[in-house]
């Protein structure tokens, strides 16, 4: 017999009636542990009779705290001395992200696709393919040279990215395909308050929300258009980061809508924090790197892609998040390698205060479809003249 799902209101009434959790679980054909988790969720909405609280907030507005007015107890007071209480709630981040993603998909559904960019280059090899990870661009970041040693804003970011990316593409071989990867944190902030959605950290930003949002989409188009001119086929991998849970996913929808008429580009929007590409004997995984330990990624790949794991001989993860290039000493796990990539923006005030420092640049990694990893790796660093 299928279990009857108990609603929040039914559970509330059962508890008000004094029924024990073990009896409620039996009545609704539920396990005791599942019911206890439901009670925990119910308490998050404001139901806590042990502390004289019986509120009924929406599930997507969990209680963040209480402000209670108390006085010396009198006969008319509650047992706790409470006179009035204000319930403070917060918007559940996961529900907020899901709602925002649906809204974004609806808003951009009518975007007119861009004209198809013709391929006029030539293909030197189809046995290899190029991967270009764009490490944590943090578009919108602003730094002050007197504080961190270098000025950085939207205008500087646009100029530097164009110069460095052009030099990189010039030096890369003309493989048939390029895998262009947004490794996450494309935008420095995620809302109009200039914060991340997860931590609500206040960030140093160059101007208003719309200003750096527009600049970011222009820079992303520059990356993709340049790759479409050089490579016959482009696979765009979008991986949202911890700085841009919502806007990072919006990038995937935006790019897909703009280039949906171009058969030379395939877009992975970023619905999952883990994205995969298989080419010949090579299986690649892409993640920002903030949702789990890097050492857990080989097992994650084997679990998610167990069929492709068995059909390939070389497996490799490419991640962002840590802002430094670890390919020289990247970690070799049984059956899989894991590396992180560097970034182009300078360190912000927080990183500067923590004595962080690393070379700044972008790289192209050439993989061989038959043998896997190729020692060919071309890196372009930021120059003082950029």
Predicted regions and their residues:
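Short, amphipathic alpha-helical "recognition" segments used to contact nucleic acids or chromatin
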Residues: 2-19
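Flexible, charged surface loops at secondary-structure boundaries
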Residues: 16-17, 124-126, 172-175, 278, ...
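Short alpha-helical "recognition helix" segments of helix-turn-helix
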Residues: 23-26
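Basic, amphipathic N-terminal segments that precede the first structured/catalytic domain
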Residues: 31-174, 368-370, 382-386
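Histidine-centered active-site/metal-ligand motif
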Residues: 32, 138, 242-244, 288, ...
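Core catalytic region of metal-dependent phosphoesterases/phosphodiesterases
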Residues: 119-120, 124-137, 145, 150-252, ...
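Conserved beta-sheet core of the metallophosphoesterase superfamily
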Residues: 228, 255-266, 270-271, 278-285, ...
